[in-house]
Amino acid sequence: MLHHAKVGTLLGGENQVAEVCKRLTEVGLGEIAVVVGERLSYPDEKITKKYAKNLCEETFDKLAVAIFINDHPQPRRLAPGIKDEMFIRGKVPMTKEEVRMVVIAKLGIQEDTGLVKYDQNSGQCMTSNPAPVIYDVGAGTGSVSIELSLLTEQGTVYAIEKKPEAVELLHANREKFHVGNMEILAGEASEVIPTLPAPTHVFIGGNGGNLFKIMDQIYAKNPNARIVLTAVTLETQAEMLTLADIAKRHNVDFNMVQMAVTRSREAGPYHMMQAQNPVWIVTMG
């Protein structure tokens, strides 16, 4: 609905309109107009038109359809690159724009092709390339989660964060960018991950000192998950060297690069280059 002027949908329950409208309101799309048609072509046919934010508690007949009208649809992003200043930041650390672009590229996320194959061993029909399930561990302001959500409409991004101030920023940024496929989970990653579906892709920007436990949990859920990690401190970089052994144990590829970004800034009438902190980026899988 974010990217289209009109979206029509069939409804299967009396509370379905309310649930959709609640979700739209949560992500800052409460001003979308909703037209609900109940029992169309019957003598008691009824048409209701209201804003989504005003339909969060209403119930409708099970025989209903709805049209969602967005007067200000946004063009769909084809590549990452939201400017840092666009995010609501506070004092919470944020993965910067250039690093985000490399991280997202290294995650290598692909959307569901819709192709279904029959697996002879299990006797079941299986999706050849399922919709992505992405963890953002230590999500901070949500800059990576937001970019991933906007680029991966078929998937779900789980933003995991333990700091209350950061969780507030996650909600604020999700509403600002109108992201509907991003779930925010407050708590320690090692306690949250067991409750989630198996991931296809994981970004770890912060681990709270539980990196190896988190890695074990991820591989227990999906040994083929693709994982990207970043580190700025020497202590975290030292931990990353151990990840090479973990990758070998799980028989997955391991790659480590260092990224150093230098940005221009104004100094009176002049322009100078200012170096940012170097960042280590590890890719596994």
Regions found by a protein language model. Give the residues of each.
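Conserved class I S-adenosyl-L-methionine
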Residues: 112-120, 131-140
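A contiguous loop/helix-start segment that scaffolds small-molecule binding in enzyme catalytic cores
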Residues: 6-91
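Short SAM/SAH-binding signature in class I
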Residues: 5-8, 198-206, 213, 226
